[in-house]
Amino acid sequence: MRQQFLYVNGQDIGALTLGLLSEAPLLETFTVGPEKFLESLDGFLTKHDLSVDTLDGALVITGPGSATALRGSLAIMNTLAFTSGLALFGHEKPKEQSDLVFIQSLDLSKLPAEQGELEPVYAHEPRITRTNRDALRRLKPNP
């Protein structure tokens, strides 16, 4: 029986790419934000008559990319792995490389399952700024 692997790429804040990995990979990109990633994954699995229990594993892109998007996609996949025992294969992918080219360059038989949770690789350091508002959310006067 042929193995079924899910492909999940949540590098981009405005899109989620999902796929089934086989001789001819099937890829679909959903133009949604992280708040719709789980809904998109559910719809994708339903459309292709799959469930997490029927999958042999998932190849998950860990970055680099948007911090918010990666936290969303990895939280979903880490939760599925924890609750269902789904094997996760974490891999970095250059953001400019197409998903199809990336998938075709891999040998799935040589990817070891990650131990524990997958962790994101961010595109840059966090950009934390000070607020210009007080505790009541009023603009502070300029000094």
Can you name each region flagged by the protein language model?
Residues 57-62, 68-86:
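DPxDG-like acidic metal-binding loop motif
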Residues 32-35, 67, 71:
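Residues at secondary-structure transition points
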Residues 44-47, 51-64:
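Short HxH-centered metal-ligating active-site micro-motif
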Residues 1-39, 47-52, 83-143:
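Oxyanion-binding and handling regions
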